[in-house]
Amino acid sequence: YFEARNNEDYEAVIALESRAGTYGTNSDGSFHKPKSISSVEQWQRFNQGGVTNVFYPEAIQLSEDVVFVRLYAEGMVTAGGQASDYRTRVTMNWVKEDGKWVVKTQHYSPASYGGVHRTQKADFEE
């Protein structure tokens, strides 16, 4: 999904999203978004550009057709001609539709790494 977004392959992005629509929350602090059915044109118009790299992805199967995913995303994004660094925590729910895994929900929250919480040794212990 993120590879398709980085490559601006919006047809692949759309194919990996639920045809019934997705629910999302952006990392900009705005309110939760209503159900959205994306189009290639929307992605072309609103994608920020740049490259986002995925770190520490985890997938936890909640049921036969629901998987919870969490990861960190970091990279550089471009908006209005200005490039800036991007760090966020991501949680997603993937569901099986017609035998294919697709994104149903996405929640992005800013990761300032030290703004609220200072990393401790215990953060990395099992």
Regions found by a protein language model. Give the residues of each.
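Short, aromatic-enriched amphipathic alpha-helices that serve as compact interaction elements
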Residues: Y1-D9
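Beta-strand elements of well-folded, non-transmembrane domains
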Residues: N6, G75-A79, W94
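A short gly/proline-enriched turn/hairpin at secondary-structure junctions
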Residues: L16-H32, Q42-G49
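A mature extracytoplasmic/lumenal domain signature
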Residues: E17, S27-D28, L71-G75, V90-M92, ...
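A short local loop/turn or secondary-structure capping micro-motif enriched for an aromatic residue
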Residues: H32, M76-A79, A111-G115
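Surface-exposed, charged secondary-structure patches
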Residues: I37-S84
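Short beta-strand edge/turn micro-motifs at domain boundaries
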Residues: R87-R118
